[in-house]
Design a protein with these regions (language model features):
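Alpha/beta catalytic cores of nucleotide-metabolism and tRNA/nucleoside-modifying enzymes
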Residues: 1-2, 10, 14, 20, ...
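Glycine-rich, positively charged N-terminal anion/phosphate-binding segment
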Residues: 2-4, 19-94
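N-terminal small/glycine-rich loop or linker at the start of catalytic domains
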Residues: 3-15, 49-68, 102, 106-110, ...
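Hydrophobic faces of well-ordered beta-strands that scaffold small-molecule active sites
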Residues: 14-18, 39-41, 69-73, 96, ...
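Active-site beta-loop-alpha junctions enriched in small/polar residues
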Residues: 19, 44-46, 74-76, 101-103, ...
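Alpha/beta enzyme core
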Residues: 82-96, 100-112, 121-197
């Protein structure tokens, strides 16, 4: 199903969620190749951009081959958020997303991320300022609420809509849940029924069947896949194919997994240098090989790998053993 944000018409309505330490440029490219309709960058601190932090350049980088990309900012100062949105709006981004759902303590303790769900008035100031400052669409991602005593996703979505936000993405857990328990898809349904702007559902989409159920049970306009895409960029092709045809494509073969890991490693090496790439591939390898025989041994061995050549040799040895 097509999806439109601002003037950008997406190929489909299946999104790659922003994930710190995961959705860098190489991984977004792989997910786009596998059919993601749109991806979102790792979250970027507006203050860090303001103060010209050296790491922000890498976080803000995109490639034309990625297709539509949204850049995700976090912060709680309306003036800074608006100024940075204006500063980057001429960049190659289809939209500017605002993180109001991150549950990490260092973000929350700084009154950012999901902390803003406890302060809707401040969140409203941030969104209003950003919408006024730019022509590009502003979207916002948030949670069910801060905790079970303050479930306010519906009110929060209405507030965002009144500010002129183009779309909202809702994760069906509270901040206190982090990623434990089960995502509450009914809150996504409630948000969808309460606003006229597009609603993107997020939380516990790990299979094509999950994606279809979310659409059917919530009526949401789009699906955002986060943890389900870790080590599994194929999920986008499998979801879109299933939604379009009802046919369930098989998962990747061992050789396809091996080839994807190698491509990922090569792309990371070109982008970040071999030492950093091999260090980051340790996490990705754990995700790619989850469920395989001897995966624990493989994860242990990858920690010793320091070169792309070493990665290729390890994969050859271990995949043959499988």
């Amino acid at each position: 199903m097509k999806f439109k944000i601002g003037d950008t018409l997406l190929d489909n309505n299946v999104f790659l969620a922003p994930m710190a330490g995961v959705t860098d440029l190489p991984f977004r490219l792989l997910c786009r190749e596998q059919g993601a309709g749109m991806s979102v960058t790792e979250m970027v601190s507006a203050k860090a951009i303001l103060y010209k932090n050296k790491n922000t350049k890498e976080l803000l980088a995109v490639d034309p081959a990625e297709g539509p990309v949204s850049v995700q900012l976090f912060g709680s100062d309306p003036e800074i958020m608006a100024a940075i949105a204006a500063q980057i709006q001429d960049g190659p981004y289809a939209a500017i997303d605002v993180n109001m759902g991150c549950p990490v303590p260092k973000i929350v303790n700084n009154h950012e991320g999901s902390a803003l769900m406890k302060d809707p008035a401040q969140a409203e100031k941030v969104l209003t300022a950003m919408v006024k400052a730019v022509k590009k669409p502003i979207t916002v991602k948030f949670r069910k609420g801060f905790n079970d005593q303050s479930i306010n996703a519906v009110e929060f979505a209405k507030m965002a809509e009144s500010c002129g936000v183009a779309a909202v993405a809702v994760h069906g857990r509270t901040r206190e849940q982090y990623y434990s328990g089960k995502a509450d898809w009914d809150i996504i349904r409630q948000v969808k029924e309460a606003v006229k702007i597009p609603v993107i559902g997020n939380g516990d989409v790990f299979t094509p069947e999950d994606a279809k159920r979310m659409l059917e049970e919530t009526g949401c306009d789009g699906i955002m896949v986060g943890r389900g895409a870790k080590g599994n960029p194929w999920i986008f092709k499998r979801i879109t194919h299933y939604l379009e045809t009802g046919e369930l494509l098989p998962g990747p073969t061992l050789m396809e997994v091996r080839d994807m890991i190698l491509r990922h490693g090569k792309m990371l090496t070109e982008y970040k240098g071999e030492m950093t790439a091999m260090r980051e591939m340790r996490s990705h390898m754990a995700w790619y090989t989850k469920g395989m025989r001897n995966s624990a041994t493989l994860r242990c061995e990858i920690n010793q790998v320091e070169t792309l050549e070493g990665l290729a040799e390890l994969l050859e040895k271990r995949m043959e053993a499988e």
